[in-house]
Amino acid sequence: MASIRPPRGMRGNRPSRARTRNIDGPRYDTPVMNESPHGSTSHGTRTRRSNRCLAIVLAALLASGLATCFGAAPAGAAVYPVSEPDPFYAAPPEIGAYQPGDVVRSRTVPASGYPGATAWQLLFRSANSAGDPIAAMTTVLIPGGGGARPLVSYQPFVNSLGLGCAPSHGLFDGGLREAEALNLLLARGWAVAVPDHLGPTSAYGAAKLGGRITLDGIRAARRFGLADGPVGLAGYSGGGMATGFAAALAPEYAPELPIVGAAMGGVPVNIGKLALDVGGSPNPLFGLGFAAAVGLEREYPDVMSLDGRMNPAGEELRGRIANACTDEIIGAAANRSFTDYFVGGMNDVSEAQIRILHENSLETYPGVPRVPVYQWAGGNDVVNPWLARDVAGRYCAAGTPVQFDIIPGADHGAAIAPGSVNAFAYLGDRFAGLPAPSNC
């Protein structure tokens, strides 16, 4: 198979693979893809290894900067968000009696900001990372007109720990920065499902959870009345992580769904390697990294506990941002690093922690999408586009058509707009039944 190959001018600055066996995970012999860059740029962030913690860490959206230490300390009490005050979100005691994707309750809400659309919110049954039943939420926007229509599940980037920051709120209170993109989808006549993919504890960083919630949200929307059309997936950055995991999980977790394509951009595909790249020194977005550590602790409290590893400043910060949204999180720890908040030596992480890291990183998660994939990244993205290219190469080797594009000169924030235009056109072609392009 032909390889997805970087342009000649980009090869010299490719960061070397992290040498830590645990972080790297399994090695895949993958082809290198023939990228479709519209020009050459260089990515020059070199891996820092001198400050490798005894921990797994994650950087997420809008440049990413997670640097924190998970150690072998005894499990303590994770700090969870204040409960959602709206009783509509509450899981019924019998949630385990429902099947994944079953609608528990529904309601209409005003579709302010989405002209001509109607909006429904669906509480449905899903499963957390341990497989336990949970209640999750998706908001479904339906454009005017009748008949069968495609459904796009759009996963927003949500860099938050508070339940009030979830898409089901941000869609209508101005907090969701991707509302304009949703109107572009509605203008095409497509229904749009927007899941609260961080789950009922706002477990920021738990990407596999986001994939499950996304798929069960699609099931819920179809069982609610949108079962006649094809399905597409889309998302960027943290939303791209949930999108990528939904595509990779679907063949086993939800094989019955008629998903015809997935489009994802700016995706952090290996949370450990990204941490080694950006976590060893002060970073303006370090707060997002700290928040992701808190989110992983919420989803895996017995293994990813932060108790005993934080100094008093870390304990205070964890409590202060427990209900915060993106801007507050960024401001709370701007230009800090893990040494400001954590204590401990340079020991290796445990096998259980490595397992959790791998199951939340697309590079090391073995599942492969069975539908065509469009993937894009900015040429100057701090979220290393080379790792995403490697994942695309593995998908190519497994027979999945992948179109991988580099947006020349774009950093993480700038790549979303042009890539989304291409992504929506790509999904439109999949809905029309056209052959999927591929630069495998």
Regions found by a protein language model. Give the residues of each.
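Short, surface-exposed "cap/lid" segments of acyl-processing enzymes
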Residues: 128-137, 141-184, 196
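Primarily recognizes the serine-hydrolase "nucleophile elbow" in alpha/beta-hydrolase
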Residues: 219-286
